Each structure stands twice: as structure tokens, then as C-alpha cells.
Amino acid sequence: MDMFSWQLGLPSTLACLVFGYLLGSIPFGLILTRMAGLGDVRKIGSGNIGATNVLRTGNRKLAAATLLFDALKGTAAAAIASYWGVEAGIAAGFAAFLGHLFPVWLSFRGGKGVATYIGVLLGLMPVMVLLFAAIWLAMAKITRYSSLSALVATAAVPIALYAAGNGKVAGLFAVMTAIAWIKHRANIQRLLSGTESRIGEKG
């Protein structure tokens, strides 16, 4: 599959982008913590709306629910749009990822995108989720760094997709990986300085 060719018409592409963005911009971490009476998750820990920061409330079930819903919005966007072809799924999935990172409802301050990244991957190439999970779990067991595990796993995905002959999807995830790394720049700095929190530690 040619990574650079694009056959989907402009109106259809725009429709997929809008659909994906609106779905991806739903801030489940914020909604769930408020519904649970835990206040504004943006005012605790890292200030992030993702599952890792929700976990800092001490409510593991709520963090798991946030992870699930943040992933599923990416899956739904990509899978539903894919009914009209892989390019539609790519456009909607990418927009859902951006919607999570930059939700218009929260002044464009969202999460770091790993859960939604996984969700989009599930919607487009389900088998690759197994690769992501295997790498993440292996790295987490060895290093106990959640952020490093995610960074390594996201780096491996586009390489594996390209090697499998899925050029367009590989291109999508190469871009998403680059964005995810940028969103994790503070984590990268802490990893380099040895101050990043390990799994099971508060911080």
C-alpha cells in the first residue's frame, strides 16, 4: 500500500476529520472523576486528563474506566469510518487522536494520547495491539517506567506496520508516534535526569 497516495475526496476526508475529532475530544477522565465526586482531575498530579493522572486520585477502577473509554473513542472513530475505506478510517482515527490531545472544550489542553493511540490501532490493525501490549509489558517489567514503556511501544508500531506492508497505516502511526513523543517531552527529560516516577510510585 502506497504511503503517500490519497484517494479519498476532500469532502469525505473533512467529514471524517470532524467526526473523529469530536469523538476524540470527549474528556472522559475529567467527566468520570467529576461524576465520582473527586473534583477536577486537572488540579491534581500532573494536571493531565488521562488514566495515569486519574490513578493518582487513588481510584483504580476509575483510572481503568478512563483508559478504556479513551481507547474506545479512538477505536470507534477508526472502525466506524473504515466502513467507507481504510483512508476514511485513517482520517477519523488521526482526528480522534488529535481531539484527545487538543480538545476544544478544555482550551485545547488534553491528555498525552497513548490510550487513544492504542484504540485507533485496535480499530485499524487489531493484531498490532498484541505487539504493542507485549512490548509495553516487557519494558514495564524490566524498567518499571510506564512512560518509557509507552515510548518504546509506540516507536515499534509504525516500523512493524511498514514491514508488514501497511504503508498508509504505518505513515499514520509514524506521525502519531512523533506527536506522542512530543507530548511526553517532560517525561523524557525526567527519564534522562533519573527523576521519572516508576510504576507503583506516586508523583
Curated annotation (Swiss-Prot):
Domain of life (superkingdom): Bacteria
Reaction it catalyzes: an acyl phosphate + sn-glycerol 3-phosphate = a 1-acyl-sn-glycero-3-phosphate + phosphate
Keywords tagged on the record: Cell inner membrane, Cell membrane, Lipid biosynthesis, Lipid metabolism, Membrane, Phospholipid biosynthesis, Phospholipid metabolism, Transferase, Transmembrane, Transmembrane helix
Any single GO CC term annotated in Swiss-Prot or TrEMBL for this entry: plasma membrane
Membrane association type: Multi-pass membrane protein
Transmembrane domains' residue ranges: 13-33, 62-82, 88-108, 118-138, 159-179
Leading EC class: transferase
Single GO molecular function: acyl-phosphate glycerol-3-phosphate acyltransferase activity
Subcellular location per the Swiss-Prot or TrEMBL entry: Cell inner membrane
An individual GO BP term: phospholipid biosynthetic process
Pathway it works in: Lipid metabolism; phospholipid metabolism
EC id: 2.3.1.275
Assembly behavior: Probably interacts with PlsX.
UniProt record similarity statement: Belongs to the PlsY family.
Entry function: Catalyzes the transfer of an acyl group from acyl-phosphate (acyl-PO(4)) to glycerol-3-phosphate (G3P) to form lysophosphatidic acid (LPA). This enzyme utilizes acyl-phosphate as fatty acyl donor, but not acyl-CoA or acyl-ACP.
NCBIfam families cross-referenced by the UniProt entry: glycerol-3-phosphate 1-O-acyltransferase PlsY (TIGR00023)
Record protein name field: Glycerol-3-phosphate acyltransferase
Gene: plsY
